[in-house]
């Protein structure tokens, strides 16, 4: 019965989220879960728009909503906001959401038993793009999210490592505290925390359904800014946790998984870019590109596999040769972003820039002009 369900804290770090915060809190309050076991925490991270007023109004309506204010000079980015609230939590589980997240009503009553039964320290929900039909770029991101979930599940199935994705990550509070909370010296709290969990022997699971819905960015500039941050944080953590990852705390299968992941995601794009540059300068044919083309081809097949899987939430993009080609061409952006970020990180000192992604809710027109 309900008595068996543990206490859950749903946590959102919100900065300037007036477009989506009301919808989010209303949806969370409607989740099917024992009301005395569910608290909603919103950290208003020095918002300069109407977010604080909206939250004050929502607190009048929803008793389970707790709002924390954070001053503008608090520092630590999203991790700092999450650490602020972490000190006050008492629930067994902490579900971290972005302000643009949308959950099905049955999410918690399915997710929590899955996490408990599997013995997971954390579970990442599959991310599903809510605005896939807006343009080709949002459709490609919907494919990429399905691809990512397929790859994460595949890595787990061969004894590898699954990773947290920030939005829709369920964390067991005692495991999180044992890992030292959120790292405030990173631009990607989720990728960093994934390695903290791995190094501390805390297993991370992945759940295909129910998914968490989120907005894909609408334009190329916003995409490249977002991906630059992901690439920087993703690469930085290999240096931050390198010693732990190489130690005997990890199973050999996990170390092999991380090595393959590092070679494919970071080394190969850098080599491919250098190879292409060298070929252009010497007017010869590039030699590493066949490998890159095979990798992109396999990614294309994984996209098809993911998008054809039965799924709840927003419909995944229909699959045909043209759609697969779009997905593969789109993935090529990593072959630009990764080398660029790698060179910049090698030459410039570490600098922390939390580039906030704009969440629009239903207002896509505003973004087209932004």
Residue ranges of predicted features:
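Membrane-embedded multi-pass helical conduit in multi-pass membrane proteins
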Residues: 1-2, 260-349
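Acidic donor-binding segment of Leloir-type glycosyltransferases
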Residues: 26-72
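Cell-envelope/extracellular polymer assembly enzymes that use nucleotide-activated donors
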Residues: 6-9, 39, 192
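Long helical/loop segments within the catalytic core of UDP-sugar-dependent glycosyltransferases
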Residues: 62-71, 75-92, 105-187, 224, ...
């Amino acid at each position: 019965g309900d008595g068996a369900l543990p206490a859950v804290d749903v946590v959102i770090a919100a900065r300037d989220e007036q477009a989506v915060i009301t919808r989010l809190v209303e949806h969370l309050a409607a989740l099917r879960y024992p009301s005395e076991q569910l608290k909603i925490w919103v950290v208003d991270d020095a918002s300069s728009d109407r977010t604080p007023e909206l939250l004050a109004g929502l607190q009048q309506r929803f008793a389970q909503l707790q709002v924390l204010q954070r001053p503008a000079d608090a520092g630590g980015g999203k991790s700092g906001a999450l650490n602020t609230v972490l000190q006050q939590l008492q629930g067994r589980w902490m579900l971290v959401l972005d302000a643009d997240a949308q959950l099905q009503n049955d999410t918690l009553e399915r997710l929590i038993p899955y996490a408990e039964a599997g013995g997971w320290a954390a579970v990442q929900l599959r991310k599903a793009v809510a605005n896939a039909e807006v343009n080709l770029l949002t459709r490609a991101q919907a494919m990429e999210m399905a691809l990512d979930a397929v790859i994460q599940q595949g890595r787990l199935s061969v004894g590898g490592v699954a990773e947290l994705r920030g939005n829709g990550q369920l964390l067991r509070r005692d495991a999180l505290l044992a890992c030292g909370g959120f790292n405030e010296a990173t631009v990607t709290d989720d990728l960093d925390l994934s390695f903290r969990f791995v190094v501390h022997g805390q297993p991370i699971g992945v759940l295909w359904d129910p998914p968490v819905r989120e907005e894909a960015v609408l334009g190329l500039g916003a995409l490249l800014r977002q991906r630059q941050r992901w690439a920087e944080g993703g690469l930085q953590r290999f240096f931050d946790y390198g010693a732990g990852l190489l130690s005997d705390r990890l199973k050999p299968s996990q170390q092999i998984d991380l090595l393959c992941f590092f070679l494919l995601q970071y080394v190969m794009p850098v080599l491919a870019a250098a190879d292409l540059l060298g070929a252009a300068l010497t007017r010869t044919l590039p030699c590493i590109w066949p490998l890159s083309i095979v990798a992109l081809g396999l990614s294309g097949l994984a996209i098809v596999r993911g998008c054809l899987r039965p799924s709840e939430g927003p419909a995944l993009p229909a699959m045909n040769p043209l759609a697969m080609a779009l997905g593969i061409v789109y993935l090529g952006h990593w072959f630009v972003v990764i080398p660029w970020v790698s060179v910049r990180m090698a030459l410039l000192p570490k600098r922390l820039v939390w580039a906030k992604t704009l969440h629009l809710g239903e207002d896509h027109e505003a973004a087209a002009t932004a």
